[in-house]
Amino acid sequence: MNTKILDQLEFNKVKDQFTEYLQTEQAQAELRDLVPMTNPERIQNQFTEIQEMSEIFVEHHGFAIGSLRDISEPLRRLELDADLNIQELIAIKKVLQASADLSRFYADLENVELIALKRLFEKIEAFPSLQGSLQSINDGGFIEHFASPELQNIRRQLKACDDAIRQTLQDILKKSGHMLAENLIASRNGRSVLPVKNTYRNRIAGVVHDISSSGNTVYIEPRAVIQLNEKITQLRADERHEMARILHELSDQLRPHTAAIANNAWILGHMDFIRGKYLYLHDKKAIIPEISDNQTLQLLNVRHPLLINPVANDLRFDEDLTVIVITGPNTGGKTVMLKTLGLAQLMAQSGLPILADKGSRVAIFQEIFADIGDEQSIEQSLSTFSSHMTHIVEILNTADSNSLVLVDELGAGTDPQEGASLAMAILEHLRLSQIKTMATTHYPELKAYGIETQHVENASMEFDTATLRPTYRFMQGVPGRSNAFEIARRLGLNEIIVKEAENLTDTDSDVNRIIEQLEAQTVETQKRLEHIKDVEQENLKFNRAVKKLYNEFSHEYDKELEKAQKEIQEMVDTALAESDSILKNLHDKSQLKPHEVIDAKGKLKKLAAQVDLSKNKVLRKAKKEKAARAPRVGDDIIVTAYGQRGTLTSQAKNGNWEAQVGLIKMSLKADEFTLVRTQAEAQQPKKKQINVVKKAKKTSSDGPRARLDLRGKRYEEAMQELDAFIDQALLNNMSQVEIIHGIGTGVIRDAVTKYLRRHRHVKNFEYAPQSAGGSGCTIATLG
């Protein structure tokens, strides 16, 4: 895009408004180089970056990069094999530290969905070793003692010599204090000296380094410290040499990474620039506009960014609208409206937020041209007809259908009749070339052109006849009218004269009356639109309030739900502990008395009332497999309340069923158990093992033994089956069980071991003998 338009519309002044929001020199440089873009994807990406930055600020209000110097010159010097000075190394050190901080920030970032910024965050490289090396230089520009053993040794010697000199001079001060002009140790030419009164200069042996301006004081380096001062001078030279070597070494460490460090610095600067754009958007109540794909424009409540209290206006360029002609007198803000449109486009195409309301839409133009002769503009510049036409010729020779043309006072500066004809012909050429154009003029002849010509629309700036002042309100679709008669009348001109003037221009008066009616209708429409907008704003506020209340309610609901879940879990834990106690009592008593069985059943039913097993995955699965027929004797069932397996033995006259559940006989209603399978199905080979204890053949171990195969099971499924298996084994008075878990990755085996170790009814357990499965099978003794 041509750079001339940037000066004409004062775009650099707009860019200057962003400076206060930037912290890094890199971002300042990016702002200086910023120019409008013509690639919609690049523009949209920058808008996405701003939007994502706003989402970051929702979670982290204080997000900032920090103040960073531009390190492009130090990096260039590194590439030329030059060594960096301390300040340059500090600047790079700060960039590396900021890079590490930004990486940590991204790693900890939650509740924010990023796309454009994610690519930036993930391109940052960390250099912990370089950061460690650069810690030897502190931010004050001092090379720390630990930078090298040699430097540490030199500084240790320096301190020793300095202490020795100070002690020697202190001794002289005590002995010869009356000879001194001041009771202190001074320094001249980098050497420690004493201020001796001139009358005693021969009483203290040493080298004179200076004499005061009055001649009364002589600065003498006593002979006793000359050798020590010589040593200090040498040590200072050694220190400088060692520091230079350290700077060279640090520069060499940085040299291979210049490209990556430069990339980090660019990302930090660009992130700071995005942050600055968001802060501008927030402070100025700006927005990110939509991008149209057909050169349509819709600017809602758009404001001029350089004015202190700009009037907001709506402006649209529909697809079938090519030319807008703003007619009317030379006051009222026509030029400002031209610049407002141009600046909104330049800002948007530069990836900057614009001063408008949500719902605004911008087009993407390859070029924007302007001819603005601003007698009344922000920057005044006079334009003769010749220079005016020269600019118009350049525009007509260059502009095409992908351009936006802005012309102020088209055809001005020459004979009104010829100027109006010329203006009309130029606008017609632009219309036929399908070039989006906005032009201002005070020629009344162009009103008719705007009304009669397709794809052309009139517009004007509102004028308040009551106050005789312009309101700066843009009225699209309404041509401008002269207010001369009304102004003259209100200023006190004789009514007879005004009437005579109106009679002399009857035709124009009729047109003005029509325009006046249009203005009134437009003003009324705008008032209604403003009322609608106010209602929309109230609705938005209401919606926000409702959303806030909903979020607060959801938060309270989640807290109460979590509290309830904890209480339920405590109930379940208590119930499980009590069930373990019941099972242990059942196991301990080989002979049960009837009343004990009834008591145990009562306790189990009481537990069932406390624990809701409706969400148990095993029960849900069993329910899905329930046969679509009535239950019958011999069917396998699962008792819903306990999750225990049993078999139907008989049906009572009242419709209830008798079931054998382990050692216990139970009376159940039809809705208190789930049918698993038929007897015939039970005799068929099982494709998949379920939670059931299979009687094993007698082994040499005491008591019966059961086996559970967990191979191929998922962790959660295996643990559910193991838990039910142990419970059933205890109910069946098993003394020993086998759990086949295989070797595999060891996850199931370790889980089985952990489960058995904490189960109170498992006396001990061990892997099976090698011949019986080895570490792929665990034998547990119950008791």
UniProtKB/Swiss-Prot annotation:
Q: Where is the Smr domain?
A: 708-783
Signal sequence region: none
Q: A single Pfam family, by name?
A: MutS_V
Q: Does the keyword Ligase apply?
A: no
Which residues hold ATP? G328, P329, N330, T331, G332, G333, K334, T335
Query: Does Transmembrane count among this protein's keywords?
Result: no
Disulphide connectivity of cysteines: none
| Biological process terms in GO annotation | mismatch repair; negative regulation of DNA recombination; rescue of stalled ribosome
Q: Which family does it belong to?
A: Belongs to the DNA mismatch repair MutS family. MutS2 subfamily.
Job of this protein? Endonuclease that is involved in the suppression of homologous recombination and thus may have a key role in the control of bacterial genetic diversity.
Q: How does this polypeptide assemble, per the annotation?
A: Homodimer. Binds to stalled ribosomes, contacting rRNA.
Q: What is this protein called?
A: Endonuclease MutS2
Species source reads Streptococcus thermophilus (strain ATCC BAA-250 / LMG 18311)
Give the source lineage, highest ranks first.
Bacteria, Bacillati, Bacillota, Bacilli, Lactobacillales
